């Protein structure tokens, strides 16, 4: 535990969103959000805190979302909306900053798994997306024309911006990737493209993803996968919020939880096998950087 848990303020909470592992609540009495554990097989809140403070924060520092571990009062979980979806045995929660759009950002663009809330005249905007795989899969075929993310989106018929383009070290490549999906926004997205190309955050994400040297199929005979692989998988599934106001850009990472290898290992291996045997790495139909 990074520090002793603090008491949860006595606010009235309503459901904001529910994922596979966690449920998030909001309150009109605070700008903070309350994240609670849903899946009993997922790491506990204490384990999540230990992983974030011991592994993730030392690597990405100020780019990790701010949170406080809080004690949950007896009977509190049962009193919440959607209580049946919660792990009622979990004694802790995370009180976290709200990285969502600002009140004046009432306009919305959404495409290719990118959501943008923006104010009138684009005075400010908030971008939400998952960076995904910033490096190719270690087990991808040598003649691949699709990166791991593009291969999967082709298989699932759910288009994404190629992350090798979006987070490219060349600003123009990043800017063009945004312009291709959101035409007519080049001027507005110049600060965002500069951040995607130059921020040390994405260099560190690449470094952490590079800790997976063999790929999930390469660890088939391992009783336990190394911790570097688990961290690589975590960093392939984080969410990113970026707030832009003028030339000021502030980005934060969330959903950087420790992955449950016992639950995910077979799924990861099966998915990679499907991508390879189905020829998805070599099929045309994407706008992947590797095709150029």
From Swiss-Prot:
Any one GO MF annotation of this record: inositol-1,3,4,5,6-pentakisphosphate 2-kinase activity
Disulfide bonds: none
GO terms (BP aspect): inositol phosphate biosynthetic process
Chemical reaction(s) catalysed: 1D-myo-inositol 1,3,4,5,6-pentakisphosphate + ATP = 1D-myo-inositol hexakisphosphate + ADP + H(+)
Main location class: nucleus
InterPro entries tied to this protein: Ins_P5_2-kin
Its EC number(s): 2.7.1.158
Its job: Has kinase activity and phosphorylates inositol-1,3,4,5,6-pentakisphosphate (Ins(1,3,4,5,6)P5) to produce 1,2,3,4,5,6-hexakisphosphate (InsP6), also known as phytate.
Stated family: Belongs to the IPK1 type 1 family.
Entry-linked PANTHER family: INOSITOL POLYPHOSPHATE KINASE 1, INOSITOL-PENTAKISPHOSPHATE 2-KINASE
UniProt protein name: Inositol-pentakisphosphate 2-kinase
Species annotation: Yarrowia lipolytica (strain CLIB 122 / E 150)
Lineage of the organism: Eukaryota, Fungi, Dikarya, Ascomycota, Saccharomycotina
């Amino acid at each position: 535990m990074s520090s002793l848990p603090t008491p949860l303020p006595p606010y009235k909470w309503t459901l904001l969103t529910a994922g596979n592992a966690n449920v998030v609540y909001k309150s009109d009495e605070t700008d903070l959000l309350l994240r609670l554990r849903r899946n009993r097989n997922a790491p506990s809140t204490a384990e999540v805190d230990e992983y974030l403070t011991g592994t993730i924060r030392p690597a990405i520092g100020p780019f990790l979302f701010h949170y406080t571990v809080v004690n949950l009062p007896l009977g509190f979980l049962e009193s919440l909306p959607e209580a049946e979806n919660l792990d009622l045995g979990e004694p802790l929660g995370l009180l976290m900053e709200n990285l969502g759009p600002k009140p004046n950002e009432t306009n919305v663009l959404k495409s290719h798994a990118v959501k943008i809330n923006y104010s009138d005249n684009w005075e400010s905007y908030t971008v939400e997306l998952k960076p995904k795989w910033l490096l190719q899969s270690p087990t991808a075929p040598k003649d691949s024309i699709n990166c791991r993310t593009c291969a999967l989106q082709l298989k699932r018929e759910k288009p994404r911006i190629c992350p090798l383009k979006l987070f490219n070290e060349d600003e123009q490549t990043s800017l063009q990737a945004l312009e291709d999906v959101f035409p007519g926004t080049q001027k507005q997205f110049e600060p965002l493209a500069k951040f995607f190309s130059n921020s040390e955050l994405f260099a560190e994400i690449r470094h952490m993803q590079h800790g997976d040297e063999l790929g999930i199929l390469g660890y088939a005979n391992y009783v336990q996968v190394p911790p570097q692989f688990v961290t690589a998988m975590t960093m392939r599934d984080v969410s990113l919020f970026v707030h832009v106001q003028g030339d000021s850009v502030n980005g934060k990472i969330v959903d950087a939880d420790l992955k449950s290898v016992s639950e995910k290992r077979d799924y990861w291996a099966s998915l990679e096998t499907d991508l390879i045997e189905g020829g998805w790495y070599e099929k045309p139909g994407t706008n992947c950087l590797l095709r150029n």
